[in-house]
Amino acid sequence: MKFIKPILVLFTFALTLLFITACGSSKSSSSSTGSKARTIEEIKKSGELRIAVFGDKKPFGYVDNDGSYQGYDIELGNQLAKDLGVKPKYVSVDAANRAEYLISNKVDITLANFTVTDERKKQVDFALPYMKVSLGVVSPKDKVITDVKQLEGKTLIVTKGTTAETYFEKNHPEVKLQKYDQYSDAYQALLDGRGDAFSTDNTEVLAWALENKGYEVGITSLGNPDTIAPAVQKGNKELLDFINDDIQKLGKENFFHKAYEKTLHPTYGDAAKADDLVVEGGEVK
């Protein structure tokens, strides 16, 4: 009988500990659902649509001298927020964390020039496209790269988390890659001569080369053509449907051609045609 009481005490303590642990697990599981995407009603109540964009990728998404976001992606972001009846709240992201910001519910939409790929479709849901691109390679004019074979034994600059990084790792492992988190750092590396060339979407390298004398896009199209589209958290059908409906409606108003004229034409001029880049109403032609 002497041993029964201590055993009962130990048993009671064990049950209490088990209960506390179970409660802790329950709270932990509950907190993990905190990353769930906001509903449209919640977005409207907050008064803000959180949009992931680039802050250093002119003319698509960048911060001007006044600290305001500008660019082709921003035009769409402004319109989506307006049509929801809220204000846009832009959040600067790197190429590598565009999906993560959606998954962790730090933003509602990603408009950071996000190329649609099968791998990314496993992480996020893409809406209808609003732009078409392929890869391009820019290099100094006096040592211009016009063929991928010329990159063998040379250093190619890429930005982490981009289709350029994936493409070269998969198809051209013989090319040495020098990787950067930010586009601005990657371009600066090219200017400093730390690499022989830089690859990303052809729309971007073309815009950059036009503003930086002494550089040329020697490879204007590489790999398969891709599309760029807004993305939402996986399973967020409500917001996805809204974006798709809005893109189709905006297409009837020729919205994306107007956005091109306002944000991209001043950079490209006659070097590019709107119909070669713009996707109107989500229909790729």
Features from the language model and the residues they span:
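C-terminal motif of bacterial Sec signal peptides marking the signal peptidase cleavage site
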Residues: 18-22
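Extended ligand-binding regions for polar small-molecule ligands
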Residues: 24-26, 74-83, 162, 229-269
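Ligand-binding clefts/hinges and TM-proximal coupling segments of bilobed small-molecule sensing domains
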Residues: 25-34, 166-180, 217-221, 247-285
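Extracytoplasmic small-molecule ligand-binding "clamshell" domains
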Residues: 31-113
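Flexible hinge/capping segments at coil-to-helix
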Residues: 42, 139-156
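Short helix-initiation/N-cap motifs at beta->coil->alpha
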Residues: 89-100, 143, 160-163, 178-188, ...
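A ligand-binding cleft/hinge motif common to bilobed small-molecule-binding domains
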Residues: 100, 114-122, 170, 191-192, ...
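Periplasmic-binding protein-like
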Residues: 132-139, 206-247, 266-285
